[in-house]
Amino acid sequence: MQISQDEYNKTHKITIKNNQSVGIDLGIKEFISLSNGLQIKAPKPLNKLNRFLVKRARQLSKKQHAKTKQEALQGIKKSNNYIKASMKLNKLHSKISNIRADFLHKLSSLIIRNFNYIGLESLNTQGMMKNHKLAKSLSDVSFYEFNRQIEYKAKYQEKEIYRVDKFYPSSKICSSCGNIKDNLTLKDRVYICNECGLKIDRDYNASLNLLSQLKQHIGLVQSEFTPADLTAMQYDLAINQIATSKVETGIQQKWYL
């Protein structure tokens, strides 16, 4: 489902210019992590519906239909049960697509409304799709579409998007001391710095590094994202039925062996 510019204009007013900035890390466990401590979750119905989708597809394959060109030439036709099952599968595909489109439209609009400068990583999506462990998750959350909507909405409202180089190791750099942890794996959900002892959520750490790169690029004095701003944003997300969580302040701490 595509959102036209006219539809966008009706529901989203031009935002007031400010110097507030944010680093955004796109993840698998959480859809995105923001440098203000908020983490956005993908819609829960998608997980359930995707499992149901697999079940429907298996049921469809068992119904009578021509499975090869040779069978088609032999006159094997689709049974009524196959046609009915196919219609149900298409309906489910549409439902999943609509939920995903609604989520991405609302989320990208809220980010553009709250921030004037946005730091994002330049993901090598094609390369990541080659990893079978990541491919399904990347397909479900539609990173490409999220990036596309952020780009065109930022351009329309004259906000600035800064793309950090795709080879910048945002997840491996300690946001406190700058040490690089080369042995960090996808299984490591908590970043523990071997140099200064910082213990912090992995994705939150990456978002802080992206924010740091953004600030170096724009070179402006930034206004602070206050607790009141954070509360207002959480409320805005809640009324739009977007699930969030806040990074535990206790997890961002230095510890020493």
Predicted features along the sequence, with ranges:
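Substrate-contacting helices/loops that form the catalytic groove of nucleic-acid
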Residues: M1-N147, L220-L257
